[in-house]
Amino acid sequence: MSDKKLLEEIKKRRTFAIISHPDAGKTTITEKVLLFGRALQTAGTVKGKKSGQHAKSDWMEMEKERGISVTTSVMQFPYSDHLVNLLDTPGHEDFSEDTYRTLTAVDSCLMVIDAAKGVEDRTRKLMEVTRLRDTPIVTFMNKLDRDIRDPMELLDEVETELDILCAPITWPIGCGKSFKGVYHLHRDETILYQSGHGHTIQDVRIIKGLDNPELDTAVGSDLAETLRDELELVRGASNEFDQELFREGQLTPVFFGTALGNFGVDHMLDGLVEWAPAPLGRETEEGTIESTDGKFSGFVFKIQANMDPKHRDRIAFCRIVSGKYEKGMKMRNSRLGKDVRISDALTFLAGDRSLLEEAYAGDIIGLHNHGTIRIGDTFTSGDNYRFTGIPNFAPELFKRIRLKDPLKQKQLLKGLIQLSEEGAVQVFRPLANNDLIVGAVGVLQFDVVVARLKAEYNVDALYEHVNVATARWVYSSDEKKLDEFRRKGEQNLALDGGDNLTYIAPTMVNLQLAQERYPDIQFTNTREN
């Protein structure tokens, strides 16, 4: 393949994730992004739990039951001469490491904010994660068809609380019942609101120029005057869009609209494909691999078991970092030093899978995993380097898990190890007893594990309280000191799902004392895969 063709394909791609607080409208936005990309003919409105119509991107049984996204879905669709890869992250009150790791696989993020509520807790947390790699952020202020907070106040809150400059690209005219549309600052045009629902995208009327008398007729002279006054203020007080600051993660372009009303999503998508970076390179232990490097490389950021109950399979999601995947090509798993021939990689439209002939840097492909692939694995076309920066996080919540039927211990352990390889939860086996302790970043993960053990491994399990406050992975460059620590601290030591030594502390004070007592031992709350 010519370098020119490879560069063209890579330049076309945009890979992003949506981040938001639960109920800010993230799943609806996902639907509408797909609708405007024409990937879905019917955007299934996210209904309450009783409705039979489920959102396209929520496709695991538990997600369908609860009307929430629990796992990361991957969807690819074309949009205005580009190919967009959208990674949908869990949107419920819990989220897992899955969410964090998904953010390592994207080049930009869309932040969705409920304009009636402003910046909320989950958004803060997710923004902290995007900060680790200075990911460019596009902002969508949602739910303009409801009564919202003052738009200037919202911008001010984003700037203060999330420490990022705001550059409004569109500006709302009214809200709630009197929402009339938005003014596009870059195009000097007013786009009038026509409510579209489901898969209806209304033709919109556009009025050129801010002083056009047609504007007063269309929205009413009061709203038109308010708009002109507000825009004077906006132009004086807010930031101009700056591509460089955006790419550095320091400034976010802001769009207003209503995902439910199919309005404003296309303006945001236009901005995203125009300004967001094409696939970026990634760091390895030996330096950066650029996306334009002709050789294939990629890393696994997620493993999903049993995506297809008919197939009983496990799929490893691999972000292609450089080069091109071709059906039947050989790939090397750097961790194992083994070559495998891959002829059945998958692409996804949220649970709809199809076999892939080729894929390029920025794309996400699914690899069938028969227990040999782990999160963080690097695949190359023959080199032995490994990508860095795909973390495991120390869990914050712990429970002991036990069986209703003690004869199923083997199945329980197998299920837990597989689920921990997926990154859904972490499992710890204390050195001093036969307990199995499950650690998670959020409460819902515990429910997910019990439901999946039952459905996929035919194991009935329940939880008990366990006296664990926190966990840390332990390392030392001094083998003797580590052996001594292992001997003396056995009561508090465990092995995780990958057999890594872990310190399990009953209290934070206990952890502090252990750190003081053993200065040669490193206690870390993240572990690179």
From Swiss-Prot:
Keywords from the named record: Cytoplasm, GTP-binding, Nucleotide-binding, Protein biosynthesis
Transmembrane segments: none
PROSITE patterns (UniProt xref): G_TR_1 (PS00301), G_TR_2 (PS51722)
Ranges of residues in domain tr-type G: 11-280
CDD domains: RF3, RF3_II, RF3_III
GO biological process: regulation of translational termination
Pfam families reported for this sequence: EF-G_D2 (PF22042), GTP_EFTU (PF00009), RF3_C (PF16658)
Residues that coordinate or bind GTP: 20-27, 88-92, 142-145
CC annotations in GO: cytosol
A GO molecular-function annotation: GTPase activity
Subcellular localization(s) per the UniProt record: Cytoplasm
UniProt KW GTP-binding keyword: yes
Family to which the UniProt record says this protein belongs: Belongs to the TRAFAC class translation factor GTPase superfamily. Classic translation factor GTPase family. PrfC subfamily.
Protein purpose: Increases the formation of ribosomal termination complexes and stimulates activities of RF-1 and RF-2. It binds guanine nucleotides and has strong preference for UGA stop codons. It may interact directly with the ribosome. The stimulation of RF-1 and RF-2 is significantly reduced by GTP and GDP, but not by GMP.
NCBIfam families associated with the record: prfC (TIGR00503), PRK00741.1 (NF001964), small_GTP (TIGR00231)
Protein name: Peptide chain release factor 3
Source organism: Alteromonas mediterranea (strain DSM 17117 / CIP 110805 / LMG 28347 / Deep ecotype)
Gene name of this polypeptide: prfC
